Design a protein with these regions (language model features):
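Short polybasic/polar patches that bind polyanions
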Residues: 15, 39, 77, 145, ...
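Acidic/His-rich, divalent-metal-binding segments that scaffold phosphate/diphosphate chemistry
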Residues: 1-64
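Divalent metal-dependent catalytic cores for phosphoryl transfer on phosphate-bearing substrates
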Residues: 43-149, 159
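Conserved active-site and cofactor/substrate-binding residues in soluble primary-metabolism enzymes
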Residues: 5, 25-29, 67, 84, ...
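A structured, mid-to-C-terminal "fold-capping" secondary-structure block
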Residues: 133-194
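Predominant activation on well-ordered alpha-helical scaffold segments within soluble catalytic domains
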Residues: 11, 28-35, 70-73, 120-123, ...
Length: 194
């Protein structure tokens, strides 16, 4: 089992440097998505590690967007995060804001799913249900093809993420929708308490 800080400690660090509800919601979503993927892909014993990486992946983004994934190691060291966790967090910015390569499967999942959760979340907000619970891949693909929709979500990063994992775009979308379904209620509850 890989070592990581207690969730309460990780969440406190996130909130120390992030106050915007949107950023906290995104972090909680990616935390839940990463936990789901760990269990789905056979890494259940490391689910807490995967989830912590998801929770902290954007720890530096709100205060230091121009130093995203560069400032993160310093912040993560405040709570004694391992080099492995720091590498994983930084790797999701590969080719975007840093040159840390995603090597482990978990890092590749984070790289792929991070951007896609933003697109899925935006698509969910457009649905009558405002939820991913009734979202299908075919509906998401229509939004994906519309470059003006959620324009800040890079389709190139999502495609590269799927390629790094050796998955089709549809497979990545389907799995990430399922992952977001698994944590949507808990994330909404946590965000409403902010």
């Amino acid at each position: 089992m890989k070592a990581c800080p207690a969730r309460e400690e990780a969440l406190a660090l996130l909130k120390k440097y992030n106050s915007e509800p949107f950023h906290i919601q995104h972090a909680l979503t990616v935390e839940g998505v990463m936990r789901w993927y760990a269990n789905e892909l056979g890494y259940g014993e490391d689910a807490d590690f995967w989830a912590t990486v998801g929770l902290l992946h954007d720890v530096d983004f709100e205060k230091w967007p121009e130093q995203h994934c560069v400032k993160a190691p310093e912040l993560l060291q405040e709570i004694g995060c391992s080099e492995e966790l720091i590498h994983a967090v930084c790797s999701h910015g590969c080719g975007i804001c840093c040159d840390v390569e995603p090597v482990e499967e978990m890092e590749k999942v984070l790289f792929a799913a991070d951007e896609l959760t933003g697109l899925i979340g935006a698509a969910a907000r457009m649905r009558p249900s405002k939820s991913v619970q009734d979202m299908e891949v075919s509906s998401l693909k229509k939004k994906y093809k519309d470059k003006k929709f959620a324009a800040g979500c890079s389709r190139d990063v999502i495609n590269t993420g799927a390629e790094r994992l050796g998955w089709s775009l549809e497979e990545l979308m389907e799995k990430t929708i399922l992952a977001m379904r698994s944590c949507e209620d808990a994330v909404n509850e946590a965000v409403s308490a902010l």
